């Protein structure tokens, strides 16, 4: 599995701001979107382009445009919505697929409860977004769902990842690509990432 920990100074700075315990909902939400945008920049660096001729101000001009790759952004509800706008800044014409999965706090197992995928998803590259890759259960379940629907090109974008979640994802889906702003220390006994960000969903939606 291709694993990319994005080490750009802006990413590290913004993620560091997000780790503040008393950060406001507004600021956390803004930063989640901004880091999501920067991760998208990295994750789409290998998209192919083709030369086309357009009408410029001084006549015909040859430019490069992305070659035919259709994209669907897949936020995992609910926290993934906090990164979605940042992703769409770079791929505004992407279609949105939505997957709802929550983690049972006792068993730590993923529980699917909603899905709405775009049509012809087998023709699209999926950018799956979720702030945290902890145990990996929710992400694995989401990718299972996408593959069962025919999607084969899948990239995962997360703000922070635990080594345990990375290992689980790699074992289940070695063909996906992972882009993260940080590979953190690991999980505590409750399955939370340390040092992590706390409950990203609560911080994004103001329910903490």
From Swiss-Prot:
One of the GO biological process terms: UMP salvage
UniProt: 5-phospho-alpha-D-ribose 1-diphosphate binding residues: 78, 103, 130-138, 199
Entry's Gene Ontology molecular function annotations: GTP binding; magnesium ion binding; uracil phosphoribosyltransferase activity
Keyword Lipoprotein among record annotations: no
Cofactor(s) this protein requires: Mg(2+)
Regulation (activators, inhibitors): Allosterically activated by GTP.
Pathway info: Pyrimidine metabolism; UMP biosynthesis via salvage pathway; UMP from uracil: step 1/1
Enzyme class, spelled out: transferase
EC number: 2.4.2.9
Gene3D superfamilies: 3.40.50.2020
Reaction(s) catalysed (UniProt annotation): UMP + diphosphate = 5-phospho-alpha-D-ribose 1-diphosphate + uracil
Domain of life, source organism: Bacteria
One Pfam family, short name: UPRTase
Protein role: Catalyzes the conversion of uracil and 5-phospho-alpha-D-ribose 1-diphosphate (PRPP) to UMP and diphosphate.
Family: Belongs to the UPRTase family.
Protein name: Uracil phosphoribosyltransferase
Lineage: Bacteria, Pseudomonadati, Pseudomonadota, Gammaproteobacteria, Enterobacterales
């Amino acid at each position: 599995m291709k694993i990319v920990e994005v080490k750009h100074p802006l990413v590290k700075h913004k993620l560091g701001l997000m780790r503040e315990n008393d950060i406001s909902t507004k600021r956390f939400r803004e930063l989640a979107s901004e880091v999501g945008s920067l991760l998208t920049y990295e994750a789409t660096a290998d998209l192919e382009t083709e030369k086309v001729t357009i009408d410029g101000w001084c006549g015909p001009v040859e430019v490069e445009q992305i070659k035919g790759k259709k994209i669907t952004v897949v936020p995992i509800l609910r926290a993934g919505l906090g990164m979605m706008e940042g992703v769409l800044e770079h791929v505004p014409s992407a279609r949105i697929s939505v997957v709802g999965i929550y983690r049972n706090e006792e068993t730590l197992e993923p529980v699917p409860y909603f899905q709405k995928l775009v049509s012809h998803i087998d023709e699209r590259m999926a950018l799956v977004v979720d702030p945290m890759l902890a145990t990996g259960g929710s992400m694995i379940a989401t990718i299972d769902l996408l593959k069962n629907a025919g999607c084969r090109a899948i990239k995962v974008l997360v703000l922070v990842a635990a080594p345990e979640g990375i290992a689980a994802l790699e074992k289940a889906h070695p063909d996906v690509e992972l882009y993260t702003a940080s590979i953190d220390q690991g999980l505590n006994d409750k399955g939370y990432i340390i040092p992590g960000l706390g409950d990203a969903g609560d911080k994004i939606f103001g329910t903490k």
